[in-house]
Every structure is written in structure tokens, then in C-alpha cells.
Amino acid sequence: EKFEELNLKAAELAAKARDKFPQVMIAGGLPPQNLVYEVDNRSDDEIISDFYDQAKILSPYVDFFNLEVLSSFREANLAIKAIEELKKPYLVGLHVSSGNELPSQEKISEIKSNMVLNNSLGLMLSCISPENYQLNSHELSKLGCPYGFKLNGFEFTTPKLSYNKTYSNGDSVNPNLILGKRED
């Protein structure tokens, strides 16, 4: 019920930061619109609508969109479709839970044949382990677009039933308790 209010507040704060530091580009974060670290199996229309609803609130205040921690090529392509009419550049953030596969079991090596990245600012692997960074950096270097990584400190990001149940129930729990905290 506070969706619009909180997104608008975040956008207004970002605009203030841009006013103070005009050389900084402001990203409008568009995370998974359902659960994170797992495939969104809802209908295309529902996913597109959810991404668009958030993007249209943020759009007047941001320079680009950050499509973040997406778990399948389908979800990423639907997010891109949702923001097309807003005419903003975007950064695509895909998640790799382990090895070189997204939670959808699609391989990083399949990006070129499943996504069009030429209109993007680039690609990043979001919320991945240092090990997954090492496993995937060479593959991303072959894409012909800017790329990067956002590392996290969890032991794993393959959700357990308790993770999904916690968030489905509307409960809030420290993710370190469910996903494990790395000690290195």
C-alpha cells in the first residue's frame, strides 16, 4: 500500500542528490517484481505491468534504469519491454546462483542468443559470489558490451523453502540468517 509513496520518496531523494552533484548519473532501481533469486513464473502481462508501474514513478527523476538481480532471460526481456516507452537507457543485472547458470538454468554463454543488449548501458552479474565472478568474467568479456559484477557476502543464493515462505508471509528476517554469511 506504500508502493507509490516509497518509490516517489526514493526518486525525490535521488533528484536532490543529482542537484547537489550534477556530474552523477542517477539510477532507478528495478529489482525482481516477485521473489528474488528465483524464476518469476507469473504471466508476461503481470510482470511487464509490475515493472512499468515502478518505472513510470521513477522515470522523471532518474537518468537510467538498473534492472537488477533478474533470474531469467525472460524476466530481463520483459523488464526491457516494460520500460521501452519511457526512453531511458538501462543496465541489465542478471543473477547467477552457482556456476554459470541463472536460477532459470540458462547459461551465461547463451546471453547473446537470448537477449539484445545493444541498446543497454551494459550487463552486470548481480549479487553473486566471488567464485561466480571468477567463473563468468571471461564469458562476459566476449559479449562486446560493457560489463561488471556486484558481489555479495552470502554463502549461497539458492533459496530454501524457508526463504520463500518468510517473504510470502510478509515476514522480515535478516537475509544472513537464511542465506548464510560468508566468513572470508
What function would you assign to each model-found segment?
Residues 1-184:
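Domain-level signal for soluble alpha/beta catalytic cores
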